[in-house]
Design a protein with these regions (language model features):
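PLP-dependent amino-acid enzyme catalytic core
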Residues: 1-185
Length: 185
């Protein structure tokens, strides 16, 4: 997936109506000059809302009418549920059987249909991909999706706007979507 700065700028334009920039705060207990980007203050308490919302907003009307599906054990699931509630799009969210009830309830609170399936994420994702193909829904990957990465990249744009002289940015890495977006910005 080739992500561009233009993708991230478009994502920021889409998200402005729905999300406020998150604060950057000093963390003196971590050392001189360490700042934290407070993504936990987003509506779903995670950066994942940015990518999920951008991915749903980037869909055309026909794709939204068919609905979206994803596989996630928590934060991305809640982000997709919020995004589809905000855009009046149907969402099916597959979650591994062991997903904490708090995460399942979060999905349902935002209007998503939570389906527990699979003993691990790979099984859950494979089933979501199968259903997307068979039922004509759009699969929104938690990490391997251009629009999801672009949404995450808006964090990088905000950092550059809020801290223009930033020397380095430390980013947690799991699936790679967050770091891809921030590094591109």
């Amino acid at each position: 997936i080739m992500l561009t700065l233009a993708d991230i700028v478009r994502a920021q334009q889409r998200l402005t109506r729905y999300l406020q920039p998150t604060a950057v705060e000093s963390a003196p207990e971590l050392g001189a000059g360490v700042l934290l980007k407070l993504e936990n203050t987003n509506r779903t308490h995670s950066f994942k809302i940015r990518g999920a919302l951008n991915a749903v907003l980037a869909l055309d009307d026909a794709a939204r009418a068919r609905g979206v599906i994803t596989a996630s054990s928590g934060n991305h699931a809640q982000g997709v549920a919020y995004a589809t509630q905000a855009t009046q799009t149907r969402a099916t969210i597959l979650m591994p059987k062991h997903t904490p009830q708090k995460k399942v309830q979060g999905v349902r609170r935002y209007g998503g249909t939570a389906v527990l399936f699979g003993d691990n994420f790979d099984q859950t994702e494979a089933e979501a991909l199968r259903r997307a193909r068979d039922e004509g829904m759009t699969f929104v990957s938690p990490y391997n999706d251009r629009q999801v990465m672009a949404g995450a990249g808006t964090i990088g744009l905000e950092i550059l706007q809020q801290v223009p002289d930033v020397a380095r940015v430390l980013v947690c890495v799991s699936g790679g979507g967050l770091i891809s977006g921030i590094a591109t910005a």
